[in-house]
Swiss-Prot record:
Keywords: Glycoprotein, Lipid-binding, Secreted, Signal, Steroid-binding. Expressed at very low level in ventral prostate. It comes from Rattus norvegicus. The keyword Signal applies. One of its GO terms (molecular function) is steroid binding. GO terms for cellular component: extracellular space. This is Secretoglobin family 2A member 1. PROSITE patterns: SCGB. One of its GO terms (biological process) is androgen receptor signaling pathway. Induction: By testosterone. The keyword Secreted applies.
Amino acid sequence: MKLVFLFLLVTIPICCYASGSGCSILDEVIRGTINSTVTLHDYMKLVKPYVHDHFTANAVKQFKQCFLDQTNKTVENVGVMTEAIFNSESCQQPS
């Protein structure tokens, strides 16, 4: 599960700023992914503009389900890790 999330972060082209990724759409999707109160149905509505076939839809459902199956502590740690990445020295907005 943690490896899957790492691969997701590696494949996303990230333009980082001091708070969040710098892309409100990406931030919203990440928040929806790690928020255990967002149901699978609501999550699919959130990502619908970016899912163009049933193969991708199935992968996205499985990905969200991985987060729904995790403990609150694990999901909280993913949020901390995401913020640490976005706020890291190598991800700072140029002055």
